[in-house]
């Protein structure tokens, strides 16, 4: 049984050791643009590791799981 409820996350590789939440949403194709990321984050629709996250600049690292709607993506290096 998975420790994170919800959909199985897709691994999304990043180039650096960390990435900002807004950038990752776009990279993982969870949103179309950075402009679209801002309101969904502000509205509390995004979860990081199961917790609501409202900071677009939140730094994510390998292993973090981001969910939006029915989709999930895991930060991978």
What residue spans do the PLM features occupy?
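Short, structured beta-strand/loop micro-motifs enriched in basic residues and often containing a Trp
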Residues: 43-51
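Ferredoxin-like alpha/beta domains used as RNA- or RNAP-binding modules
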Residues: 1-27, 47, 55-77
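Short, well-ordered loop/turn sites that connect or cap secondary structure elements
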Residues: 40-41, 60
């Amino acid at each position: 049984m998975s420790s994170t409820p919800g959909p199985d996350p897709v691994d999304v590789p990043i180039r650096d050791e960390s990435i900002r939440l807004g950038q990752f949403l776009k990279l993982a194709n969870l949103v179309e643009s950075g402009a679209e990321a801002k309101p969904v984050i502000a509205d509390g629709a995004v979860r990081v590791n199961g917790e609501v996250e409202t900071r677009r600049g939140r730094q994510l690292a390998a292993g973090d799981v981001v969910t939006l709607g029915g989709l999930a993506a895991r930060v991978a290096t």
